[in-house]
Amino acid sequence: MTIKISIDCMGGDHGPSVTIPAAISFVESEPDAELILVGLEETLLAELKKHKASEHPRLSIVNATEVVTMDDPLEIALRRKKDSSMRVAINLVKQGNADACVSAGNTGALMAISRYVLKTLPGVNRPAICSILPNQKDGPTYMLDLGANVDCEPQHLHQFALMGSALVSAMEGNPRPTVGLLNVGEEDIKGNEVVKQTAVLLRADHELGRLNFYGNVEGNDIFKGTTDIVVCDGFVGNVTLKASEGLGRFVKSVLTTEFKSSPLNMLGALIARGALKAISQRMNPSRYNGGSLLGLRGLVFKSHGGADAYGYQWAIKRAFDAAKYDVLTRISTKIADLMPQSAATPEDSAGAIPNATIEP
């Protein structure tokens, strides 16, 4: 079965210099993948020729005459740049010509255009960006929101928990994934009013058997693997994500410096080379690149804007796997079961522009 993924090749900090090599590497490693490269045709063709892949049978180009920059206001990206590579790539999903879309572009624009073109699933007020982080249990911790919604009300965090539960059930085959609410302490009295009110909603769902709510969790619980899912607003989630990425690079830098500081340390590094390589791979942020815009009527994945080709390839893989295992249908069914009485409010309608302005 061939899976078609549309790639917004112009998005991100590096554009085609990263997206094209990533696309080539992925399609060569995955025989069931077909990638649709969207962007300025001449630019994409030149990059493909540079990598001797202009005649690849599973790489095609769809021309788009405009580019959404990282600085474009939402209004311009959504209303004026109607032939942007981002919008064309998303439209391919809407039209059924692609099974999923990947972009490293402007987060706010990607969310706004995705909501406008694809609409949200029934019962979903706001989509959220969900991705995985590593934990001590050698498994994934799913975390949302990672930057789509800076300001949230309790009902939004409540829905994020339900959507995250649906995603993990579909991806991991776990019918009762545990949900933790990120807070400054485990006690019920801790946190701001939004978090406290969210906890009340989640406990009510837990008592009804609709959700497996663990309770409040702290930042260290993310990497301990205390719960399968960690829920927070997009501001907190994005800061947490960036801090963890920075810590990983810091630890790697310190280890490299120390092991090179003396002949004895260099010998120790040589002896521990296998273990150090494994640690480096587990802590490499690029391996966890690619967040799902959860809650849309189509599969859209957000790559980190500054990702290199290796990291972008992981984002493509996550989109490919989601399409391959029909995650959208499974999530839609699960959400319908979990949120039978939920309805979008007017201000959160599918075509509204969300308050997503930060870059995950």
Curated annotation (Swiss-Prot):
Alphabetized, the UniProt keywords read: Cytoplasm, Lipid biosynthesis, Lipid metabolism, Phospholipid biosynthesis, Phospholipid metabolism, Transferase
Q: Which reaction does it catalyse?
A: a fatty acyl-[ACP] + phosphate = an acyl phosphate + holo-[ACP]
Q: Report the Gene3D superfamilies cross-referenced here.
A: Isopropylmalate Dehydrogenase (3.40.718.10)
User: Which top EC class is given?
Assistant: transferase
Q: Please indicate which superkingdom the organism of origin belongs to.
A: Bacteria
Recorded GO molecular functions are: phosphate:acyl-[acyl carrier protein] acyltransferase activity
Write down the EC number: 2.3.1.274
GO-annotated biological processes: fatty acid biosynthetic process; phospholipid biosynthetic process
Q: Name one GO cellular component term.
A: cytoplasm
Its pathway is: Lipid metabolism; phospholipid metabolism
Point out the signal peptide segment: none
Q: Where is this chain primarily localised? A: cytoplasm
Cross-referenced InterPro entries: FA_synthesis, Phospholipid_synth_PlsX-like
A Pfam family the protein falls into: FA_synthesis
> Where can this protein be found?
Cytoplasm
Give the record's subunit note.
Answer: Homodimer. Probably interacts with PlsY.
Q: What does this protein do?
A: Catalyzes the reversible formation of acyl-phosphate (acyl-PO(4)) from acyl-[acyl-carrier-protein] (acyl-ACP). This enzyme utilizes acyl-ACP as fatty acyl donor, but not acyl-CoA.
Task: Kindly give the PANTHER family that the UniProt entry links to this protein.
Answer: FATTY ACID/PHOSPHOLIPID SYNTHESIS PROTEIN PLSX, PHOSPHATE ACYLTRANSFERASE
Q: Which family does it belong to?
A: Belongs to the PlsX family.
The name of this protein is Phosphate acyltransferase
> Gene encoding this chain?
plsX
